[in-house]
Amino acid sequence: MTLITICGPTATGKSGLALDLAHRLGSIILSADSRQIYKYFNIGTAKPTIKEQQLVSHYLIDICEPTEILTLAEYQKQAQSFIQSPGSQTDVVLPTLLVGGTGLYIKAIVKGLKIPRVGPNEKLRSQLANLGQKQCYKMLQQVDQVAVEKIHPNDVVRTLRALEVFYVSGKPISQQQGEDLPNYPILQIGLDCDVEVLGERIRDRTEKMVEVGLVEEVKCLCEKYGEKLPLLNTLGYAEMKQYLAGDISLAEAIKATVLHTRQFAKRQRTWFRGYPEIEWFDGNAPNLLDKVWERVREFTRILAEKTQE
């Protein structure tokens, strides 16, 4: 088992690089994108095209209906099944490529996060939410002091999740968390660009998405699932939904999408820069593929030498 991750801010060229590397390695690509797991959300999520999926096998995309929820634990389980037992899933030989910008997905794999196996309980969450955040936080203080020290008093989502895990499993969430590092080699590659260059790439990509049918995609999704579908409030879709509602012009929707995407990229950069194991490359470098390929070959050569010892 060997894993190569390719991470970094959006629009840095992760998917293209992964496609080239996977083709050279004869490997598969696992998506680490929290929106590409959903069917029908294609253009706005920059999902690999049918042609790209035919060139290299992609997994963990289109595995959920837009109305479903995939927990982090479920994602981790599915990803690990490919990484640890690729022969049972495909005819492709490792290394496996894990590619995307959802930091928590990648962390769940490379850090081996221990995640409570408690699924969402909407009825319980609703009952707790009706009590108000202040009361819920007091309840959490009584049952899990360790979790309280890590959760801000105003963090409704994490407070409800901690209480949900406790009441469903009978054990504090803090006792069900931690890390269990994988026992296989991992090479972590990160792509980034100069801020202004990345801004231009984001603008170009957004305009391209609109050209190839993003507005039509959003319109169809609204008609099929209703405008209140949570996924339609995410980056790119929310802005185009505003345009379709007549609240803003198309130019304004594009401008807002670019701005929000740049803000998102900044948050992604902050997240990934917190992990010193990641080896960074300039996503705008003309010889990017050659540089990364050289590092990958070095990585695989060292592993081969260790295996022969």
UniProtKB/Swiss-Prot annotation:
Top-level taxonomic group: Bacteria
Keyword entries, A-Z: ATP-binding, Magnesium, Nucleotide-binding, Transferase, tRNA processing
Region Interaction with substrate tRNA, residue ranges: 33-36
Pfam families: IPPT
Cofactor requirement: Mg(2+)
Top-level EC class: transferase
Residues holding ATP: G8, P9, T10, A11, T12, G13, K14, S15
Annotated GO MF terms: ATP binding; tRNA dimethylallyltransferase activity
Residue(s) at site: Interaction with substrate tRNA: T102
Catalytic activity: adenosine(37) in tRNA + dimethylallyl diphosphate = N(6)-dimethylallyladenosine(37) in tRNA + diphosphate
EC number: 2.5.1.75
A single BP term in Gene Ontology: tRNA modification
Record carries keyword Transferase: yes
Binding residue positions for substrate: T10, A11, T12, G13, K14, S15
Entries under NCBIfam families matching the protein: miaA
Family, per entry: Belongs to the IPP transferase family.
Chain's role: Catalyzes the transfer of a dimethylallyl group onto the adenine at position 37 in tRNAs that read codons beginning with uridine, leading to the formation of N6-(dimethylallyl)adenosine (i(6)A).
Subunit structure: Monomer.
Name of the protein: tRNA dimethylallyltransferase
